[in-house]
Every structure is written in C-alpha cells, then in structure tokens.
Design a protein with these regions (language model features):
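C-terminal motif of bacterial Sec signal peptides marking the signal peptidase cleavage site
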Residues: 16-19
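A residue-level marker of the well-folded mature domains of exported/periplasmic proteins
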Residues: 25-396
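Membrane-proximal amphipathic alpha-helices
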Residues: 21-23
Length: 396
C-alpha cells in the first residue's frame, strides 16, 4: 500500500511536469527515478520495523556477588557492591544473585564461589582483601568465568602470584580521599581530630596517613595548631571496649573522629553523641546510616571509594566483550570534576563559609593537576609540619 501511495504521488508530479511543458521522455525518467527512491524508502522502513519487532537476544552473562565476612546490609563494602551489581543487572536484563559464605574463612568463600559457578553464574564479583586466598584457589581453575575483585591487591594475592587472564582486581588510592577528608575537617574548623582505624591493613593505613597529610596541609594554610590522635581497633566492628576508648578521646577534647573500618563507626558515634562530637564516615557516604542511628548532623563527611563505579565499568566491559583481566588496576583521580573520580568525599559533606563546595572542587582540581601530591607510603609515618600526631598503636 505504501509503495502504491508513493507511486501515485510521483505520477502526480510527472503530470505536473508535462503540463508545464516537459517532454514525455523527461517525465518517464522522473517517474523511474522517484519510484526507485520511494521503493527504497519503504523497504528501509519495513526492515526497521522488523528489527524492532524482533526480541533482543538473551545475554548469557550471569552475575554472582559473594559477600565477605559481612552481609549486604552492612552499609559498607558488601551493601554497596551488592546494590551496584543488582541495579546493573536489572537494567541490562541479566541474571543476578548473591551468596554469603558460611564463615569467615577461605574454604567457606571458595565453597560459595564454586556453588555460584555450579549454579551457572559466569561472572563472580567479590569485595574486599579477604577474598585473596579464595581467588588464588579458584580463578585459575575456572578459565571460562570472569572474576572481578574489589580492593584486592597484588600483595594480598602474594608476591609470586601470576594473575590469570580471567581475573581483574581493583585497588583504590585511599590516601587521596583520606587527604580530602582531613583537609576538609580542619578547614571546617576542627582542630582536635582523631583517627580510628579498623585493622592496620594497607587500605586502612593509606586512609589514615592521607587523613594526616590533608589535615597538616590545611593547618599550615590556616596557621592554626592541630592535634590528631591515631589508633587501630584491630577489628572491623565496634564494641564496648572501643567505645570506652573513644569516650576518653571525646572527653579529653577530641572534636571529630575519622572512623575507618566497616562497622567500627558505631563505637565512635556512640561516644560522640554523648558530648556533641562529630564523626567522619568511610568507603561510602555513611551520613544516612550514622545520622539515622545516632542523630542528625553527626557525620561531617565521608571519604569514599568508587565501588559502584568500578562495578558498572567492569560489568559493562563483560557485557560488551571488552573485559580484560590479568591485572591489578590502581584507581584514583581521573578528572578535575570530583564526581567523576574513583575517590572523593561525600556530596553530603557539611560545607560552610570556611570550606565551600567550590573550595572542595578547587582542591580536587589541584590534586588532579599535580599541584598537590599525597604520599602513598605505608611503611613510614607521614612527615608533618603543622600538626601534632599521637600514634597510640592498637586498642586490642
């Protein structure tokens, strides 16, 4: 019908040409030319309609996330990774599930990985250095499965371990967002700071040493004396002993504590609310969680890693066939725009006239441009010029 209509329109045009004095031969040539164009256009439309009507091929990508010793409600690594995987898979129409190991042990994590593979999942996502042993045991054995490990370094896997082509590991430059948090805290007017680390693993140490460097830089700019108390809880959760330790800090004048280590924030928050103190969150924006549990406005900022961004990037590469393993990628600043980076502080930061969002953006731009450098050395305490740091070892 569309072809007939098109031809009729063309004939009308031809008759108009003849009526205006055109020759019969010219008219015939015009008819043939216009008819061919109309037929081609109709054929193209039909092909487009057929393609649109055809169902998209079902992807064979099936994604499984394995939790570490926590759960998907931990408001930290597990939850962020789970939610990012789930959202990506729902958007792309991919099968997704998660598995929780029976215990905090390598053999339990191996069992969960193998169960997921037996269930048909061919992409395994794992958050945290605790997976190193399980990865070493499984990745080489399942060459047709893609493994994505977040915050797992070469050192975690072993100096002699050769990464197989199906294993991608991401680590983060925590010293950079730690620096941002320390700088922001001092610029916002806090001069008695604390750092409560979970365990002294490389990522936590980088956070802490970056925090010290950032606070030192801000103190030097402002010309104010700043004190920092620094300790590790030797665990990634809060308890009565750590809360009591934090009580002594806040009672002695500590104004704000960077609680760096999963659920260990609970001890800092419990102590802070008793005296009107503040806390800084870690890994993800913890303001909603901490403030929801302990009181509005308690969380000044959070030093964050781009876990969700990494998940989206790597799963996207799996889907489009560009996934490349056999590497440990060190993720940090990729832009002068804060939100585009793999390390940053939270959008919920309590900016003020003394440290505005524009000030933060300028800080990130200078860091990206190399005007500000931050040491990632974890073997020696960072050199400082304007702050006093009291390193107190481990609480336990």
């Amino acid at each position: 019908m569309k072809k007939i209509t098109a031809l009729m329109l063309v004939l009308c045009m031809v008759f108009s040409l003849v009526a205006c004095g055109g020759s019969a031969q010219q008219a015939a040539e015009k008819v043939e030319e216009k008819a061919e164009e109309a037929a081609a256009a109709v054929e193209e439309k039909v092909e487009e309609a057929v393609e649109a009507a055809e169902p998209a091929a079902e992807s064979d990508v099936k994604v499984a996330m394995i939790t570490d010793y926590g759960d998907i409600t931990d408001q930290s690594f597990n939850q962020t990774t789970y939610e990012a995987c789930k959202a990506f898979c729902e958007d792309k129409g991919l099968a997704f599930s998660y598995y929780k190991p029976a215990s905090d042990a390598d053999d339990a994590r191996v069992a969960s990985i193998e169960l997921a593979i037996d269930d048909g999942y061919n992409v395994i996502v794992m958050p945290g250095y605790a997976f190193a042993g399980a990865i070493a045991a499984t990745a080489p054995e399942y060459a047709d499965v893609d493994f994505i490990a977040l915050d797992v370094s070469s050192g975690d896997l072993g100096d002699d371990y050769v990464l197989p082509a199906n294993l991608y590991c991401a680590v983060y430059q925590e010293e950079l967002c730690g620096y941002m948090a320390g700088y922001a805290a001092v610029k916002l007017g806090y001069t008695k700071l604390g750092f409560l680390g979970g365990m002294a693993v490389p990522a936590v140490v980088r956070y802490g040493y970056g925090f010290v460097q950032g606070a030192d830089a801000a103190a030097a700019e402002l010309g104010v004396p700043v004190e920092i108390k620094y300790v590790y809880g030797n665990q990634f959760y809060g308890d009565a002993d750590i809360t009591a330790y934090m009580d002594t800090w806040y009672a002695a004048g500590t104004e704000i504590v960077f609680a760096c280590g999963g659920g260990i924030y609970s001890s800092a928050a419990e102590a802070a609310v008793k005296v009107g103190g503040k806390v800084i969150g870690v890994d993800v924006d913890q303001a909603a969680t901490i403030d929801g549990l302990y009181g509005e406005g308690l969380t000044v900022t959070s030093a964050m890693k781009g876990l969700a961004a990494t998940v989206n990037t790597m799963l996207g590469k799996v889907v489009d066939g560009t996934f490349q393993g056999g590497m440990v990628e060190n993720l940090g600043l990729v832009s002068a725009v804060p939100e585009e980076n793999y390390v940053q502080i939270a959008g919920s930061t309590q900016f003020s006239d003394s440290f505005t969002r524009a000030d933060y953006e300028a800080l990130v731009a200078d860091m990206f441009a190399g005007k500000i450098t931050v040491s990632n050395d974890i073997d020696a305490e960072p050199a400082v010029t304007a702050v006093t740091v009291d390193y107190q070892g481990n609480i336990k």
